[in-house]
Amino acid sequence: MLSRDQHCFTFAKRFSFLVCIRIVNMIVVKVGGSDGIDYDAVCADLAERWQAGEKLILVHGGSGETNRVAEALGHPPKFVTSPSGYTSRFTDRQTLEIFEMVYCGKMNKGLVERLQRLGVNAVGLSGLDGRIFEGKHKDSVRSVENGKVKVLRGDHTGTVEKVNTGLIELLLGAGYLPVLTPPAASYEGVAINVDGDRAAAQLAAALRAEALLLLSNVPGLLRDYPDEASLIREIPANDVESYLEFAQDRMKKKVLGAAEAVAGGVGRVVFGDARAGKPISAALAGEGTVVS
């Protein structure tokens, strides 16, 4: 009988044999899309660890570049804040098309190219491909504007509720490094904008990852943002949500994603700094905020 960490799959039609791989010590790395991130440093560190035999998956964002492209195309971004205090991008159809152009195109292929130059056979995919990420399409969103709650319709967003790991496991088993990005697929097959941190958390849980690294342009969760000296070093796994009070802006989604990841069985989550050095190695060494 196969252990819980073994995954077997058949390469049908072209190949008639069964291939079994053992995925252990999986590391899911999510790198954000805000200004200041050193993607060259992230890719160099990732390549070094991959070539040393570690199993990694890279998930990425692209918010900063999406904002710039949207402005240049005359369709500036619109952000909404929910009654519970979470900020997200309002995604009408035109915004979704810009989002896909940047996330699936410029950002994804830019990272794949960096990794290929470093000798890593990376494959870039969105969560829409193979329905890797699936969730319910949310057509409307509640937004607080001038102290009043409004309902905005025509939104193309959702939350990842299901991760289909078969394609990812096939790629890993064949020696490829997956580079993933939103959007996800709705249950009706429509592209939906989803939060990348929470998608990465769901992916890490589905793969029973040893670690989920959430890398951004800050050193971790700060008790007194933006004072980097106020870095919170450790968060107990059973008390993550109580630290939401210290999270500002998009960090709220990272904390929420961390809570979901550890609840789903991920060994540890680290909020790390992607601005320089060896971001992945530093996070794995405990630099940043460690949730365990």
From Swiss-Prot:
UniProt xrefs under Pfam families: AA_kinase
GO molecular function terms listed in the Swiss-Prot or TrEMBL record: acetylglutamate kinase activity; ATP binding; N2-acetyl-L-aminoadipate kinase activity
Pathway annotation from the record: Amino-acid biosynthesis; L-lysine biosynthesis via AAA pathway; L-lysine from L-alpha-aminoadipate (Thermus route): step 2/5
InterPro entries, per the entry: AceGlu_kinase-like_sf, AcgluKinase_fam, Asp/Glu/Uridylate_kinase, Glu/AcGlu_kinase, LysZ
Localization per record: Cytoplasm
Protein EC: 2.7.2.17
Residues noted as binding substrate in the record, renumbered to the chain: R89, N193
Enzyme type, top EC level: transferase
Gene Ontology CC terms, in alphabetical order: cytoplasm
UniProt keyword annotations, A-Z: Amino-acid biosynthesis, ATP-binding, Cytoplasm, Kinase, Lysine biosynthesis, Nucleotide-binding, Transferase
Role of this protein: Catalyzes the phosphorylation of LysW-gamma-alpha-aminoadipate.
Family of this protein: Belongs to the acetylglutamate kinase family. LysZ subfamily.
Protein name, per record: [LysW]-aminoadipate kinase
Source organism: Deinococcus radiodurans (strain ATCC 13939 / DSM 20539 / JCM 16871 / CCUG 27074 / LMG 4051 / NBRC 15346 / NCIMB 9279 / VKM B-1422 / R1)
Gene: lysZ
